[in-house]
Amino acid sequence: MTADPELDAAIAAVEDQFGIVFNRARIVWAESAKLVHPELQPAGYKLLSSIVRAGSTNAHALAELYDMDKSAISRQIRQLEELGLVESRADERDGRARVLVPTSTARDRIARVRAANQARLRNALAGRSVEELRSLADVLRIVAAG
């Protein structure tokens, strides 16, 4: 709390809206996971999205990115492999290490889901000016930086 009750109320309103946004994000992740594969869990969807975005990565990098336990990452990766969405290959730079590579099926399904999610976001933000959207992106960047 600060000495400015108006500022405190405004920050509380922002916090409330972030809670709503985070809840909505969890719902979208769950829906998106099911669109990729009926057996895919939301955590697996997030990992798969990151693997597709990166082109290839490793379990250690994913564990750091999502601050997840390595055993949880391993379980999700095993499921992604079983569903035919990810392949584990020897790292070309270090044959002892393994890299995760999305399959073409995964790339196609993630692209479709992302297109639908982006259309939803575009509809939600319709009517906002480019300047408003840039300001929103700036505020989100500040919040994400901590």
Predicted regions: what they are:
Residues 1-42, 142:
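N-terminal leader segment of winged-helix/HTH proteins
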Residues 18, 22, 44, 66, ...:
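Short amphipathic alpha-helical/adjacent loop interface patches that line ligand
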Residues 78-138:
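Charged, amphipathic alpha-helical coiled-coil/dimerization segments
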Residues 25-28, 108, 112, 138, ...:
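Helical hydrophobic small-molecule/effector-binding pocket
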Residues 23, 49-53, 114, 141:
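Short, locally clustered residues in the helix-turn-helix/winged-helix DNA-binding domain
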Residues 27-71, 77, 83, 99:
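N-terminal helix-turn-helix DNA-binding core of bacterial DNA-binding proteins
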